[in-house]
Amino acid sequence: MLKALNLLSLYTKDVEASVSFYKELGFELVNNDGSVAEVKLGDVRLQFIAQETADKQDESFQKDAFGEPKGTGVYIYIEVDDANAYYKQLKEVGITPSTKPRDWPWEQREFVVRDPDRYKLVFYEKLS
């Protein structure tokens, strides 16, 4: 029986840049040894793995780290209280969202931000 989804591992070119970016968004740093770091928001953790560590792994890890575009077709959804206010807050600290807040038929207001490795984060507010 499934219990919970609590960790996403993402290969990154620069662990420190990813940690800094996600801390700016409001994530909490869990640990950072320089080649692997974790941040968390609520019960979900994001793990950043330096691409160069894949050189020390088997071929399947190397393919994941280097061979394919990062985040293609994947959107990581993060709920916020007020999408417009959070959009403005990010712009004020120098983070440029990819899209402006938009209302969708599924009754959410959403906007997208790309992280330093181009992973797509969707910040959304429930409208109903």
Label each residue range with its predicted role:
Residues T12, Y77-V80:
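Short, solvent-exposed loop/helix junctions and linker helices
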Residues A17, A83-Y87:
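Short, conserved charged micro-motifs
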Residues S18-Y22, L90, R118:
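Conserved active-site tyrosine of GNAT-family acetyltransferases
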Residues S9:
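Polyanion-binding surface elements
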Residues D14-E28:
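Amphipathic alpha-helical segments
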Residues K120-F123:
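Short glycine-/small-residue motifs
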Residues M1-N6, E28-I78, Y87-R114, E125-S128:
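Vicinal oxygen chelate
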